Amino acid sequence: MSVRIRLKRMGAKKRPYYRIVVMDSSSPRDGRAIEELGYYHPVERQNQVKINKNKFQEWVDKGAIPSDTVKRILNKSNFKVDN
């Protein structure tokens, strides 16, 4: 079982927001998450990203791999993610 940290789409049509979640890599995008770590609101001007940094680091230490999109979003919000 390979575990990934990725985005889960929520919200209404044309007003998306995403939860940053830990999921099995074979799960569908909107499937059941193992744990929620934070959120990303692309439409908002302020408070676009919130993440529990301790839980994120805990999952990375366990071997979870962040998706490229999650890495890009977190690096953009001044939370450095190693490649």
From Swiss-Prot:
Protein name: Small ribosomal subunit protein bS16
Gene transcribed to yield this protein: rpsP
Family statement drawn from the similarity comment of this UniProt entry: Belongs to the bacterial ribosomal protein bS16 family.
InterPro entries linked: Ribosomal_bS16, Ribosomal_bS16_CS, Ribosomal_bS16_dom_sf
Pfam family, one: Ribosomal_S16
Superkingdom classification of source: Bacteria
Gene3D superfamilies: 3.30.1320.10
GO CC entries: cytoplasm; small ribosomal subunit
Ribonucleoprotein keyword on record: yes
Key words, A-Z: Ribonucleoprotein, Ribosomal protein
A GO MF label: structural constituent of ribosome
GO BP field: translation
